[in-house]
């Protein structure tokens, strides 16, 4: 197997650059460049000297002997000065060692999986942790990376294996009084409870999609109600055209925010009105589709001239808010939330209300739930097989046990315990090179 290396510390230049090396030639590489093999897992400071005798850098080196390393192989980290020329020269030197090459994306993590240091759920959690932009996404990633999900899935898989063992015992020793008909009550009761637990877990995961994808807030209203001014103030910069001419917003504009540690996608849409313009009507149709997909719809009224608007039926929560508070002198009681997007009057309160809505949406999400669609898909497959085993009472007992085996295999594919070779390239290609 090749020895692989890569920069693990991010973009250059930087104060420090960490070069990770893993594979069978690590000991030889460290001895050659450092002039010694440092004590395992201790920082060693010294000059790094190339094989031609030239000075590379004054650096810190750490040696991690197998199997007590991230990959399970011999590993080393070289902490260099983070200049591009320094790092490139060092990488060139590493490439001169026979069987030593630059790592592919996610190859360190893939080797850790192969060596049994992590499972697929933990690998996906690591990838999500690296990509996390918000506190909620970080918490979601940690749940997978720290092994809690793996423990749960293996616990459920053990329940399935126990049920199959009891069924096999009934099939093989049906003449024994203490075995006969045992599975007809206890096993199926346990399997129904397991199916219920899986369904609840799946529902938690689908609700928790907002932690990864973000809460979708759609702003709608008639033309010139101030929707574009709202999106500009939320963005903190002009992203939408603001004029007195109606119909200037034709397509949906997106602004990504972080509120209360949650990702929030806010969309400005075309003003709702009757129009003969095909382009404008297309924008209105797009706006209606976004309303259907929204978590929160904010219907904006011009407080000086409120107008009726017809929205498509949606499961989203709908707020009617009043804009242009700074120039409204009439009755204001109809709007629980009112502000001026133009000068910011009361706008902080509006923003806080959106944040409260977002936090409320995740308040009922449990502590452990599937983090990826792949996991949810396999959990649903497991439920389908368990339910078939429970409900198909007309089948031979051995066939019902086969459904439980398929359910067990589905859970095993989540963690990578069985038959996942075709998934490895997809999962580990999502990592950065140094991971």
From Swiss-Prot:
Endoplasmic reticulum is among the record's keywords: no
Record's keyword terms, sorted: Cytoplasm, GTP-binding, Hydrolase, Magnesium, Metal-binding, Nucleotide-binding, Potassium, tRNA processing
GO molecular function: GTP binding; GTPase activity; metal ion binding
EC code: 3.6.-.-
Cofactor binding, note field: Binds 1 potassium ion per subunit.
Subcellular location: Cytoplasm
Annotated ranges, domain TrmE-type G: 214-359
Binding site for GTP: 224-229, 243-249, 268-271
Residues holding Mg(2+): 228, 249
Major site of localization recorded for this protein: cytoplasm
Family: Belongs to the TRAFAC class TrmE-Era-EngA-EngB-Septin-like GTPase superfamily. TrmE GTPase family.
Name of protein: tRNA modification GTPase MnmE
Protein species of origin: Bartonella bacilliformis (strain ATCC 35685 / KC583 / Herrer 020/F12,63)
Lineage: Bacteria, Pseudomonadati, Pseudomonadota, Alphaproteobacteria, Hyphomicrobiales
């Amino acid at each position: 197997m090749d020895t692989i290396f890569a920069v693990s510390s991010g973009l250059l230049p930087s104060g420090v650059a960490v070069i990770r090396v893993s594979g069978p030639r690590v000991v030889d590489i460290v001895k050659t460049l450092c002039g010694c093999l440092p004590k395992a897992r201790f920082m060693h400071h010294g000059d790094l000297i190339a094989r031609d005798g030239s000075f590379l850098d004054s650096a810190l080196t750490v040696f991690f002997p197998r199997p007590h390393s991230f990959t399970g192989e011999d590993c080393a980290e070289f902490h260099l000065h983070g200049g591009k020329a320094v790092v490139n020269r060092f990488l060139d030197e590493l490439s001169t060692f026979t069987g030593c090459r630059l790592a592919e994306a996610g190859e360190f993590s893939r080797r850790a999986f192969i060596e049994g240091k992590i499972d697929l759920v933990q690998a996906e959690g690591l990838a999500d942790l690296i990509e996390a932009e918000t506190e909620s996404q970080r918490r979601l990633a940690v749940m997978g990376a720290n092994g809690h999900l793996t423990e749960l899935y293996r616990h459920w898989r053990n329940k399935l294996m126990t049920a199959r063992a009891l069924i096999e015992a009934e099939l093989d020793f049906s003449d024994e009084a203490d075995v006969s008909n045992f599975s007809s009550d206890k096993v199926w009761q346990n399997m129904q409870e397991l199916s219920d637990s899986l369904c609840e877990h799946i529902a938690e995961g689908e609700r928790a999609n907002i932690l990864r994808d973000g809460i979708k807030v759609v702003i709608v209203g008639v033309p010139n109600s101030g929707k574009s001014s709202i999106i500009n103030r939320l963005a903190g910069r002009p992203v939408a055209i603001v004029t007195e001419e109606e119909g200037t917003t034709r397509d949906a504009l997106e602004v990504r925010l972080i509120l209360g540690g949650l990702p929030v996608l806010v969309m400005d849409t075309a003003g709702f009105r009757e129009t003969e313009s095909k382009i404008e009507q297309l924008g209105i149709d797009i706006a209606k589709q976004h309303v259907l997909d929204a978590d929160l719809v904010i219907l904006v009224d011009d407080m000086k001239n409120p107008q009726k608007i017809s929205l498509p039926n949606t499961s989203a929560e709908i707020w009617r808010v009043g804009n242009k508070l700074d120039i409204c002198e009439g009755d204001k009681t109809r709007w629980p939330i009112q502000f001026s997007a133009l000068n910011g009057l009361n706008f902080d309160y509006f923003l806080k209300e959106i944040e409260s809505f977002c936090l409320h949406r995740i308040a009922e999400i449990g502590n452990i739930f599937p983090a990826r669609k792949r996991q949810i898909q396999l959990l649903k497959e497991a439920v389908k097989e368990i339910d078939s085993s429970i409900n198909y009472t007309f089948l031979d007992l051995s066939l019902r046990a086969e459904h439980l085996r398929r359910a067990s295999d589905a859970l095993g594919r989540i963690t990578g315990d069985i038959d996942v070779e075709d998934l490895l390239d997809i999962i580990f290609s999502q990592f950065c090179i140094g991971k």
